[in-house]
Amino acid sequence: MEPVETWTPGKVATWLRGLDDSLQDYPFEDWQLPGKNLLQLCPQSLEALAVRSLGHQELILGGVEQLQALSSRLQTENLQSLTEGLLGATHDFQSIVQGCLGDCAKTPIDVLCAAVELLHEADALLFWLSRYLFSHLNDFSACQEIRDLLEELSQVLHEDGPAAEKEGTVLRICSHVAGICHNILVCCPKELLEQKAVLEQVQLDSPLGLEIHTTSNCQHFVSQVDTQVPTDSRLQIQPGDEVVQINEQVVVREERDMVGWPRKNMVRELLREPAGLSLVLKKIPIPETPPQTPPQVLDSPHQRSPSLSLAPLSPRAPSEDVFAFDLSSNPSPGPSPAWTDSASLGPEPLPIPPEPPAILPAGVAGTPGLPESPDKSPVGRKKSKGLATRLSRRRVSCRELGRPDCDGWLLLRKAPGGFMGPRWRRRWFVLKGHTLYWYRQPQDEKAEGLINVSNYSLESGHDQKKKYVFQLTHDVYKPFIFAADTLTDLSMWVRHLITCISKYQSPGRAPPPREEDCYSETEAEDPDDEAGSHSASPSPAQAGSPLHGDTSPAATPTQRSPRTSFGSLTDSSEEALEGMVRGLRQGGVSLLGQPQPLTQEQWRSSFMRRNRDPQLNERVHRVRALQSTLKAKLQELQVLEEVLGDPELTGEKFRQWKEQNRELYSEGLGAWGVAQAEGSSHILTSDSTEQSPHSLPSDPEEHSHLCPLTSESSLRPPDL
């Protein structure tokens, strides 16, 4: 596109007429305004040209501003700058929201203005991610959740509700958006982050076969290129390209105001000269060189849709489950079988043959300390029955799982009957094949637990405080109860779980599976207990030790797995040493051979496993509560006995004791008053001020305004 400074007066007049239908009454041709003067327009110059309507002035000045910024944005705009802009707007919005929503009945104006700024930054990033490089060659579908999060944010700000709940929801949404931005900046290759857009001119004989989508902000994108478009031009036009100029008429819009050409004007210009069509497209070129750093996968901690990982859509072997960036020298890799309906530009690369899996000796558990090849599928390792312990099956990260069948945040309820009653924990769940994993965060290197869904049945659940509850039940082993945040999440999970169960469920005549084949989990009871000994991403050495929260049957003395025997761990010194330490701990002895009791966490988890009856657990909890109450009352009674049995008790000494035990003294007076009221209703006495001989001593100064002072001897206990 030629510089605006070189535009002729005729071209300037044509561009001004294309801005809006309301500007058609102005004599733009009579102005004889060259391109250089167009860029210098201001409100005073428009007043001199008889453009007095403020709305018309805004339309023209906004378009001029867009022309000025078009070339400058090409040099500065990229994925990194747009992501950092959204991240900064999110942090600014968080700082404004904190403490502001609780003071006003309605949402303050400054909060709404900050929300509008946040929406503008999000729109700019999402429009950038709609380009062909990001929407077809790399999977950034996880980032589309930003749109859903901001729609939820808009609803929350306009709804009436408790201020604390509204502020908590807003901050949660902002943290989700910030997490997605951080993952883009950290996990995306440098080539994609710094890739800038370019302007490219394309000549077409006819606009037939070209589908253009217009957004609500009058921004025009190519959505589809049919076979009617000539081959040479079809290779130059890609889905996601933005239409900047049609037949030398700029149709772009200003970044934040609707000053671009409306769709009907754009279509009219396309059809004005069908014999020859010239387009200038703003597009992101496909890099020719591969990335220099090892590729990584984008993990979104707030994704609700089944597609999460940031991965290329190049063909792969059926057993290949590890996705990564692959910007090969071929600028147009072919689509994967899952994306056969998308546009394919260029030859399709040959699929990579899968590598044969490594064969381990029978009975040897996977060593947590040994490095693993990144091209091995974790699902393939997991399917090697009898070769891996339950702990090693959970030593797999979201990144290693690759593209999941379904993932998202769910609430997991503890097994009923805990000491503090049932509680819910928010976890990130990933359904891959027939296995359901859950993590504290999507970045964790080890799953907290896993369930073989094919051995369970899906049923609806009930809870007084949760609305969208469902559960996986088993005829023999304990159930797992979940709760979704919304009805959409519930429908998504139920649909995928039903598909998984029907696909992988064993026939009815199959023998019942063992407990270790059904589930494996880390049963950490309290977050406070976990904070001292656990981390969000434990190292392999920590993950292999039962002292770090793994209370699965392979790590508890109440239920031992036959796979962790000393005879099977003699292939290497490291495995043998690990097996010996695990065996000593399972046997209840220390490294020196001395008896060692169970840890509190192991004892509590084994108690919950032995008592699965909720009624029995509630009775036990009731007994323990009564025992604690009895213990506290005995301590209070001992304190009272000490003060009543003191032979040197004086008024001053008693007042000091009362200050130190004010709560106990108040309870004693209250109990004494109740006893007096009950006694007076049955026994009528003439002296209503006479005190019971067993009552607590009272401070003489405290009741001096109610009755005459008595002698000091009457305030002493009977034995003084």
From Swiss-Prot:
The ranges of region (Disordered) come to 285-390, 504-573, 676-720
Q: Which GO terms describe its cellular component?
A: cell cortex; cell-cell junction; plasma membrane
* Name of encoding gene: CNKSR1
> PTM comment for this protein?
Phosphorylated on tyrosine.
Query: In which organism is this protein found?
Result: Homo sapiens
Location of the PH domain: 403-502
Sum up the protein's function in the record's words: May function as an adapter protein or regulator of Ras signaling pathways.
CDD domains listed in its UniProt record: PDZ_CNK1_2_3-like, PH_CNK_mammalian-like, SAM_CNK1_2_3-suppressor
UniProt GO molecular function: protein-macromolecule adaptor activity
For bias type Basic residues, the affected ranges are 379-390
**What membrane topology is given?**
Peripheral membrane protein
Note the effect listed for W493A: No interaction with Rho
* Database matches in SUPFAM superfamilies: PH domain-like, SAM/Pointed domain
Assembly and interactions?
Interacts with RHO and RALGDS.
Q: List compositional bias (Pro residues) regions by residue number.
A: 348-359
The residue ranges of the PDZ domain are 196-285
Q: What is this protein called?
A: Connector enhancer of kinase suppressor of ras 1
Family membership, please give it: Belongs to the CNKSR family.
Keyword Cytoplasm on entry: yes
Residue stretches of biased makeup (Polar residues): 553-571, 678-695
Instruction: Tell me which residues make up the SAM domain.
Output: 7-70
Name the Gene3D superfamilies on file: 2.30.42.10, Pleckstrin-homology domain (PH domain)/Phosphotyrosine-binding domain (PTB), Transcription Factor, Ets-1
